[in-house]
Amino acid sequence: MPFEQTQLFCDEKPTILKKLDTRNEIADTIRSVSTSKISETSFQYVLKDVNICLPKINIPNEILMKHEVEKYRLLFQSKPQTARKSISVKTVSCAEECVLLCKSERAEDETVNMSAKILNFSCSKCQDSTQYSPNDLQKHFEMWHHGELPSFPCEMCSFSASDFQIFKQHRKTHRNTFVKCDICNSERSYTLLDLTKHFTSKHCVNGNFQCEECRFFTQDVGTFVQHIHRHKEVHYKCGKCHHLCFTKGELQKHLRVHSGTLPFTCHYCSYGAIHKDQLIRHVITLHKEHLYAKEKLERDQYDKRVAKTTTTGLKLILKRYKIGPTKTFWKRKTITSGNDESIGKNAQAFNIVSKTQTKSEDQSQEQVNGEKGEKQHCENGDKPVESESEKATVLSTGQYNKADEGASTTSSSVLSAVQGPTVLLVRNNKITIPANYSAKFMGFKMVDGRQHIVIKLLPANKQILPSPVLQSNTEKNSTANLSPQAVANTGFATGLTTKVNDTDFVKAAPPACSSPVLARKVISEKEAAFISEKNNTLQMVDDSKSLSSLPTTSTTSVRVTTKVEARDNVDLWENDSPQSHPDASDTSISSPDKVSLTPKPNAYSSGDMHNYCINYVNSELPAESSNSFEFSNQGSLPFHNYSKVNNKRRRFSRATLCENLQKESPNKTVTQQSTSDSDTASPLLRKESSNSDNLFASINPLNGTLKIKTEIEEPYNLEETQNFNEQSLFTNENQNLLNVTEEPKWNDIPSAGSPMMPRITSVFSLQSEQASEFLTPEVNQLLQDTLKPKSDIKEDSNNIPSKNLPFDCDQTLKKSEEVVIKSSKDFQMQDDIPVPSASVGVNVPANDLNSKCNGQEKQGLSVLQDVRDSEVTTKIPNIITLLKTQSDAIITQQLVKDKLRTTTQNSGPVYVQNPFLTSEQKNPVFVQTPKGFIIPLHVANKPGLHVFSGRPVPLVNTRSVPATLLVNKKPGMLLATNNGKPESVPTVKTENVHSYGTVTKEPCKTPFLKAEHNNSCLTPGLCSSIGNCVNMKTCSENTLPLKGSYIIKTSVNSSVKAVPNILPEQQGPKMNILDTVKQQNENLPKASLYTLMPDGKQAVFFKCVMPNNTKLLKPKLVQSSTYQHIQPKRPAGAPQKILVKIFNPVLSMSAFNNLSASNSASSFQKEIVPSKPTVHGEQKEPETSRNALPVLVHGLMPANETVHSSTTACPGSSEEPVYISERSETRVLRGKANCAVERNFNKRKTCKNKFAKIKTRIDQDSETAFVSRNRSCKRKYIDNYQEPPRKKSTLNRKGKERASAEDVQEAFGFSRPRLPKDSSRTLRLFPFSSKQLVKCPRRNQPVVVLNHPDADTPEVERVMKTIAKFNGHVLKVSLSQTTINALLKPVSNTSETTYNDFSKRQKMLKPVNSVKERFVLKLTLKKTSKNNYQIVKTTSEDVLKSQFNCWFCGRVFDNQDVWAGHGQRHLVEATRDWNMLE
């Protein structure tokens, strides 16, 4: 009996396919179903006398089941497919998803053999019609015929082979077989290859091959050839008509037409059809709604099955709106509480939950721009439990995409709070919330282009146990807005931000319960460790060593947590006190003596994993209330601030967090106990600004970047002042020991977005709001990632503040931004509370903070405290020391111990910052001043005044910290004076120190000169520009300090003593510098640099003069990397001898206030004393080393100047004197040192060739003044060579030049010297206007490479730098008018301007006689090979360009010939194997 195969079609009603219902017309119009290979044992049906219906349109049944109705329409519109891809095995689907694979058995059904390239064979042993591929036939014989060799017969002859490879070789012999065309019936013979070509050319109609004897058609010529040959075989002819069939199945299928039966009937009506495709067409046309209903039914059934398989619990439905780089919108959904889960002791902490308290759930839901909170206090006998707290949890979208309900057995990650049962468990991408808490979805947060989920936990039962006194004080004085600070967990992404509402939270416990509390804290801290993204290892924090044991005299234990944030259109304060104002946001903290709580040891759990620094800023409190300073005793993990800032309101907000402030009643000492935190990086002060003046920085443990978002300038309001009366800061050395268990390895992490790195984002305005709106977070992050240079900076060590650092200053902030700080020497030592060495504390007598600060800005002192390890000696040398580099072995040991911390910054005029500890535990202290001023400061244990200048002074870079430690990249200057005379100026070594540029448009105005006390020399540590600095990557073996001397001179009788600074390990000739410097130009007015204060004490005034047109200031030097490999090695500790000489006229208090730019400039220009260092040896110094440091002083240093440490000097090379002239034109006068000649400082007069000749030429078109120097004479100098008249005339001539150039002071800039041709050239691209956004170009645009030999101007250099930065992204560059003018006109004329020694080894600049060479630069260049470019022909925009699209791959061509040739290659590929019949 014939076997019947059933299948479902559009419903549960089956359709029967009988065995004889077959036909030969096979045309698959959509796709061919892949044949599933099944084993012989799994075949459950006897396939004897079975034929499967192969309709004309072969539609797999799963299409109907998958509801792809629209594809049915394409079935009848698309071209039929070749028969060679048809199959004999049908896939039958049913509603129960069972698939039955059937194979055709009939030998006459040779549909598979239609293929000219796919060969199938039948088994010669089984004698059935089952077709096998060569591999399947081989397996069949091995399985069923005991490993006998199969037989592969040739269909063209009687040849048979047992090996398929031999069979293939035999088939190649038939290629030369001559056959005739059966359609033409001519006598001409063709080979098989020629026959296919003949069919293609003669018998192909619109790409189809139609058989004249039957209805068969195909698009494949090989299949058509085989089909033609089949007609020669035995045929089955219909008796009622003349239809010929090749198989019995086809004949039986054809006989249905004459029988009048309709085997295919419709399930929805009485329609019947002979062929299946007719029925399909009928259903799609008339019964479409039934298909949709069936689709919906199956989808509902699928959803039910999915719901049964998933567990009940937490499930979120999140609606996302458009999310930009700077703004995030969301809808909030209430999250149901899940099951309660307890955390194990070894549970891995996956994220940080920041504690907040809000007054009500609705209030926190309404606070979109600014969240306001009210403090809640709870007391519990044994264990401090958070009665009402909101936990904000940041979850990565990738971690949460599959957030299902329920808990799993394996714990992959844990979101844990600090204390109590408030713990979110994340197991197998499922979030479980404790039963006593309810969760609220706060929305999405975009951080670094990655999306995260913010969840807030609310306690189910709210129990408020307030302390009346404490609550009243904190409500009035300690209310703060939320600062969006969250720990950037390494498990998610860089800088995860958790928007929470932090308010004061005070816990107290009886003394009897102190031990249990400590034990529980240690356990919770171990549970709350970090998961490092790099190694995914659990870093446990052991706090047993960091818990501070306090003396019994402490009566209260208060921990205050305050955060402040400025937000859009939201008042910064919700405070009852009238002192709050929108222009300055500070945290109001009540006096500690007003708080009375039960004393308990202040052991703060580091399980918080957000040990923020203490930034305890006083607000406008009464005078009797104790004021506190900012402390930074603990680091914090990095986070980004993505809060929205109103630019019209206050431009920054201070985020302060005071932890563990313990007040002692006898002497009112506030003690902070810090704990060990393995991954604490640095406290962060949020300063928000929407313009491009802010410096983006964030501490990122993932990629090792230290980004601190600070503000360049803060508006000063003179109406309101803040007085800090009698405030002094003391640090006890016994409390400066921090036990560090582990530190992340920063060496392996790339420094991304470091503030000191040259950031192109300032050029492309990627940091601004308008640019962020156009660029997606992924693109923005990609662009910033391309700017991440690897940091080769070596981490020297951490540092601690010096023992008992008193600071007393009287600061007056005036409208002209002049600050006078009077120094005092009446500091006294005060006893501090001893703390064991395993702990860290800062003892600050609250009644002895003796700092008087006037001004609207709240001035504060922030002390950075950090310790290398617990074995640091207690004796600390005096301050003003710089880092001593250590060996690589010591650095390797310290990688696990050292901790990176930086202090939070205010915008006040005075800061105390402590860089990192040296190997001798020497502690430099830097004081920040307003821009443009140098402040003398008297420091304890140090005679004389110490002058500090600049913006917040950058800290010294260390190797373990690829991210630089610049809090605010404003450079400063550090000088030391004693009784009106400069001291032996300490040394700053600049090897391993990068030279970076700021991102902001506001230029820096003073160089930063850091000094080291031992070596008695001074070197420029950092001189920043506006981001156009070249990153110097110098290794410790191949770095040399700057060559040259700065001469500091303050009065007639003052002298500078340069102490010889020769290290024992330094090789080569020794450098001997004489002791004294004699003064010159006695006819010039000489006066002391100091003026007297009203109390008779001296004060030093320095004012910087800066041209307004700072955007035209060009970099003076770019380091040539081509010379680094030829430099001899020099010990890393080799110091630098540079002296600075500053000349000032008599200035009074009133005269200084009215000091003009010309007066200040002329005072520095009068005297220029050349120094003659004595050098022994004949060692030749490379030319570039002498020019490695062009020191440009405008005031002290122009903002846009770049200073690099030279890497080309020999170890024994001479010291080159560098002369600093303070002039508005910021000229550079540099004497040249010859390595083979002795020169001493005793000679008052020098020769004419000692000085550089300055020739200035003002170009009004380009508004740029190019200042160049004449090359020094190559002949050697003799000691007694003097030329006084020429010396005097040179000075007079310079004075005339200064007078003539003062009128165009603001239009002056600097041109960079010629670089070697083999050196890398980089250019930077500026937008035409401030409103213009420079974006990455689109594709299909040619690359512009302005590598012209004459393209040496700074404008072109910027373009090249941009192209170099965005490797492969910059495809089009448009030039501004200034750039075009610079390109069209020659830079200089050889008859007028001379050139520097920098281009000695190169040819001189050729004068451009033709504009055509410059005009080439304006053309668009297209890269043809690695180093070759061709000019792209430009057409007028009015002419319509014709484009040609490739018919195969869609590639666009503008040239028809290229398009035609491209298409021919596709044709060749398509017809390559037509001569093969395999």
UniProtKB/Swiss-Prot annotation:
Predominant subcellular localization, coarse grouping: nucleus
Amino acid composition bias (Basic and acidic residues), ranges on this chain: 369-391
GO biological process, one term: chromatin organization
UniProt cross-references to InterPro entries, sorted A to Z: Znf_C2H2_sf, Znf_C2H2_type
Bias (Low complexity) ranges: 671-680
Residue stretches of biased makeup (Polar residues): 576-593
Modified residues (Phosphoserine): S653
Positions of C2H2-type zinc fingers: 152-174, 209-231, 236-258, 264-287, 1444-1466
Record's GO cellular component terms: nucleus
Region (Disordered): 356-393, 569-603, 658-696, 1282-1305
Cell compartments where the protein resides: Nucleus
Family: Belongs to the krueppel C2H2-type zinc-finger protein family.
Known function: Through its association with the EHMT1-EHMT2/G9A and PRC2/EED-EZH2 histone methyltransferase complexes may function in gene silencing, regulating repressive post-translational methylation of histone tails at promoters of target genes.
Protein name per its UniProtKB record: Zinc finger protein 518A
Protein species of origin: Mus musculus (Mouse)
